[in-house]
A protein has these predicted regions:
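C-terminal structural segments of small proteins and small subunits
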Residues: 85-99
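A short, structure-level motif marking secondary-structure boundaries and short turns
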Residues: 20-21, 54-56, 99
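Alpha-helical scaffolds flanking conserved acidic
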Residues: 47-52, 81-87
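Short acidic/histidine-centered micro-motifs embedded in hydrophobic/aromatic stretches
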Residues: 35, 55, 87-91
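Short, thiol/selenol-centered motifs that function as redox-active sites or metal-ligating centers
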Residues: 53, 57-69
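Acidic, glycine/proline-rich low-complexity segments that act as flexible tails and inter-domain linkers
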Residues: 1-49, 75
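Iron-sulfur (Fe-S) cluster-binding segments and ferredoxin-like electron-carrier domains
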Residues: 69-84
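Charged/polar positions within long, soluble alpha-helices
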Residues: 37, 65-68, 72, 96-99
Length: 99
């Protein structure tokens, strides 16, 4: 299987798999959706900040599917190229540090 070339391609494939799971595992997928909503709701940190944190964690943990979905959300939230670059610098540092 070829690697996805864009976050849209990646998220499309995963979304198809998640739709199938919603049919066969509705309780699990409902719980996952509730967890995602609780973890990204407005609080002391705004939605964009929470998504930037989530993307940094996804990058450091090398979760391609997670990266795709968080990039997709951040694009919708108006994240600038400079913000993405700053986040990438920090994520690379945290994921590839000396310890």
């Amino acid at each position: 299987m070829a690697l996805p070339q864009s976050y849209r391609e990646l998220t499309g494939e995963v979304a198809t798999q998640m739709r199938a799971l919603r049919k066969t595992q509705p309780d699990l997928m409902s719980a996952f959706a509730a967890l995602a909503a609780a973890g990204t709701k407005e609080g002391a940190l705004g939605e964009k900040t929470r998504e930037l944190v989530a993307l940094g964690i996804a990058i450091a943990s090398r979760c391609d599917d997670c990266i795709g979905f968080h990039v997709q959300t951040l694009v919708k939230l108006g994240t600038t190229r400079e913000e993405f670059e700053d986040l990438l610098a920090t994520a690379v540092y945290m994921g590839g540090g000396p310890l």
